[in-house]
């Protein structure tokens, strides 16, 4: 009985993590879409959006700063370099 309850708790944890992962993916997709498509967006606004997205991601996954820096930071940097012709 105790093992069954622990298994249910593990399933619940996995479901919650899956929801947070999906929320992060949707949020980052939206941020990257706005940065790439909004013609009125300034480089400062884009940088602020990227910083806010990082803070939000780390609030969802506090212990995953390295993962964020490896996965999303290069994508955002590349996007901003292409969009604003930064070097």
Regions found by a protein language model. Give the residues of each.
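Short acidic DE-rich linear segments
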Residues: 3-9, 85-87
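Short linear, low-complexity motifs centered on an aromatic residue
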Residues: 42-56
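Helix-centric, low-specificity signal for extended rod-like, repetitive segments
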Residues: 13-16, 47, 68, 76
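N-terminal acidic leader/helix
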Residues: 6-43
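Eukaryotic N-terminal intrinsically disordered, low-complexity segments enriched in Ser/Pro
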Residues: 1-6, 44, 66
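General helical secondary-structure elements
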Residues: 1, 15-19, 50, 79
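Helix-rich interaction surfaces within compact, conserved domain-sized segments
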Residues: 52, 56-87
């Amino acid at each position: 009985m105790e093992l069954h309850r622990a298994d249910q708790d593990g399933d619940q944890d996995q479901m919650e993590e899956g929801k947070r992962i999906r929320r992060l993916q949707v949020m980052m997709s939206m941020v990257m879409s706005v940065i790439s498509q909004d013609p009125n967006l300034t480089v400062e606004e884009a940088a602020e959006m990227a910083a806010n997205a990082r803070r939000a991601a780390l609030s969802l996954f506090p212990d995953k700063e390295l993962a964020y820096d490896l996965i999303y930071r290069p994508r955002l940097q590349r996007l901003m370099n292409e969009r604003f012709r930064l070097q």
